[in-house]
UniProtKB/Swiss-Prot annotation:
This is Teichoic acid translocation permease protein TagG. One of its GO terms (molecular function) is ABC-type transporter activity. Residues 35-267 form the ABC transmembrane type-2 domain. The keyword Transport applies. PANTHER family: CAPSULE POLYSACCHARIDE EXPORT INNER-MEMBRANE PROTEIN CTRC, INNER MEMBRANE TRANSPORT PERMEASE. Belongs to the ABC-2 integral membrane protein family.
């Protein structure tokens, strides 16, 4: 428990430097390109249009989706899950590689290594925030107006950040110790894309044909986050309506953070030896 508290204190005390490093990393990543940081938004935008064309216009033939807010265009329903995924997916990979990638740099600085996963999270947040603003505009244009349920977006955002930090702290340590783990994580991330309720309503599609699979898919904490964002904007369901699932998510996140903190503190002084 002491390791966990120390890790959290390091995030708080290093917060200003985390933001500066994240901003620097974002700029340096695109500085050699003509369009610069604009690619941070163009790339997911192109993917959004491709997915909408294939799944919305192709498979669904342009049909609307029925939600708690009434019938809405498929693209609105899709983006509610896809935009969080565009943050989650690169953060999983960047966070897992954050210590291995920057250990030599921070070894010369008065900067806690445990904050490196936070830098990866913060750098991906810039484009995520822009995409969320665009999404809200799209909602308003299509007649989906703010309701009291929108307030719980803040709650699910906190859930997402808490889980991503816990997951990244754990993964960043394992990735240094076992380099093959990074390749495994890439494969799992690609698989998760199709197992999450991004393009399909799991409860509706599997609820009747294979109801036993629904609880299994919901064991994934990312399922809770993706479904929560959609509930906030479209379905009008409160997170406390399913307290067992909420408690499961936070217990899973806490245990992951605890294990990640213990492993990180145990090996942090030996990270350089594994490079």
């Amino acid at each position: 428990m002491n390791d966990l508290l120390r890790i959290l204190r390091e995030q708080i005390t290093s917060f200003p430097l985390i933001l500066r490093l994240a901003a620097y990393e974002t700029k340096s990543k695109y500085q050699m390109n003509y369009l610069g940081v604009l690619w941070q938004f163009l790339n997911p935008l192109i993917q959004m249009l491709a997915y909408w064309f294939v799944f919305g216009m192709g498979i669904r033939k342009g049909g609307p989706v029925t939600t708690g807010a009434g019938e809405v265009p498929f693209i609105i329903w899709m983006l509610a899950g896809l935009i969080p995924w565009f943050f989650i997916s690169p953060t999983i990979l960047d966070g897992s590689n954050s210590v291995f990638k920057r250990i030599n740099m921070v070894a010369k600085m008065n900067f806690p290594i445990s904050s490196l996963p936070s830098v990866a999270i913060a750098s991906n947040l810039f484009s995520y925030m822009i995409m969320m603003v665009i999404y809200i505009i799209v909602l308003l244009v299509n007649g989906v107006f703010p309701s009291v349920h929108w307030l719980q977006y803040i709650y699910y955002f906190i859930c997402m950040i808490a889980f991503m930090f816990s997951f990244s702290l754990f993964n960043s340590t394992i990735s240094v110790l076992i380099r093959d783990y990074q390749f495994l994580l890439q494969a799992v991330t690609r698989l998760l894309f199709f197992l999450l309720p991004i393009f399909w309503d799991v409860n509706a599609k599997l609820g009747q044909s294979h109801p036993e699979l629904v609880p299994v898919l919901k064991l994934n904490p990312l399922f809770y986050i993706i479904e929560g964002f959609r509930n906030s904007f479209l379905d009008g369901a409160w997170f406390f309506h399913d307290m067992k699932y909420t408690l499961y998510f936070w217990l899973f996140t806490f245990l992951l953070l605890l294990v990640g903190s213990i492993l990180h503190m145990k090996f942090r002084d030996k990270f350089v030896d594994f490079l």
